[in-house]
Swiss-Prot record:
GO terms for cellular component: cytosol. NCBIfam families: rbfA. It comes from Syntrophobacter fumaroxidans (strain DSM 10017 / MPOB). GO terms for molecular function: ribosomal small subunit binding. Disulfide bonds: none annotated. Its main location: cytoplasm. This is Ribosome-binding factor A. GO terms for biological process: maturation of SSU-rRNA. It is found in: Cytoplasm. The gene is rbfA. Keywords: Cytoplasm, Ribosome biogenesis.
């Protein structure tokens, strides 16, 4: 299977965004954010950034984190532009990744089934 350029750019973006969130972004709304995946379109114009929150998160915390990420989008693109030497930097859109919550729910159900046996 071929490793497309969009996949390489997505991996690079994920690493750099994680570093930005850890070291440069000071907004408390995004302090618990973890970047789980990034999907970049083949034309490298758009990137969907999937994130989750460490620990149990309420709906309000999820909305607050999404708002914080969207408010810092311009700063992140500026910093990513300095770090990455790409002709065009994709437009970023942030999406909450609920797959970890779903996996946790399935795991709890399986444990409950084994407990009842």
């Amino acid at each position: 299977m071929e490793y497309k350029r969009a996949d390489r750019v997505a991996d690079l973006l994920r690493r750099e965004m994680a570093d930005l969130l850890l070291r440069r972004i000071k907004d408390p709304r995004v302090s618990k954010v973890t970047i789980t995946a990034i999907e970049v379109t083949d034309d490298l114009q758009n990137a969907k950034v999937f994130f989750c929150l460490m620990g149990a998160a309420t709906e309000e915390e999820k909305r607050s984190a999404a708002l914080g990420l969207n408010r810092g989008k311009g700063f992140m693109r500026l910093e990513l532009g300095k770090r990455l030497h790409l002709r065009y930097l994709p437009q970023l859109s942030f999406h909450y990744d609920s797959s970890f919550e779903y996996g946790d729910k399935i795991e709890r159900l399986l444990k409950e089934l084994h407990k009842n046996e």
